[in-house]
């Protein structure tokens, strides 16, 4: 996967959802160890934890992976049937909160927009 595909998706997000706050997480823990892929974030979401206070994190995350791009929609688990919303998205793998694909041209961008918009509506960010 070339960096220009990631940049293409980030540019698309910024043009489609310009009001969302942007952030970046380098994927490292407090000790500096790489624990996940670097992720570009859009929006802000209060993640609740059973053991401690909540923490503000991005709601829409975009990460480059070995197999392509993953878009994470946080805060929708149990509130939105993402696979049903994305059933006609094209060449992508869709789980309960993640849409993974190789290139933007492999998917229907209007369905991706719909899924992100619905996720934002669930958490009142849109």
Where are these regions (language model features)?
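Charge-dense, helix-prone N-terminal extensions
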Residues: 1-126
